[in-house]
Amino acid sequence: MLHKQTPEDVITRQLYHKLADETLTDLSEQLDKELDGGYADYKDGNLQIKIDNVGEYMFNKQPASMQIWASSPITGPRKFDICRRHEWIDLKSNTSFSRYIEEELRRMRSKMAGKHKK
């Protein structure tokens, strides 16, 4: 019988918190620099991003499952698990967190550009 690997098999809870906090802090800082017509607020493991003409994004630490959950007004909810290489992966779509953010930024910019043309 195959053993399904759980996040606990890969990292400790202490390392989970460190990596999740670093990821969300870095994302908050990146978006604070890039956002025009919006803001990012990170506290207590929750990152809230509001963008004019796009909507609200939420990123939350989920310590019980050792995940980061994301909610997008464009693409909906996602759950990211940490893997051995300390990279966050959406196991359902096999998409890395960094790739997901790149795609969301592209979609967000496209949506914002479309709103400005009207």
Curated annotation (Swiss-Prot):
An example Gene Ontology CC term for this record: mitochondrion
A single GO molecular function term of this UniProt record: 2 iron, 2 sulfur cluster binding
Subcellular location: Mitosome
Keywords noted in UniProt: Ion transport, Iron, Iron transport, Mitosome, Transport
PROSITE patterns found in the cross-reference section: FRATAXIN_2
Example of a GO biological process term: iron-sulfur cluster assembly
Family according to the record: Belongs to the frataxin family.
Protein function: Promotes the assembly and repair of iron-sulfur clusters by delivering Fe(2+) to proteins involved in these pathways.
Subunit structure: Monomer.
Name of the featured protein: Frataxin, mitosomal
The species this protein was found in: Encephalitozoon cuniculi (strain GB-M1)
Gene: YFH1
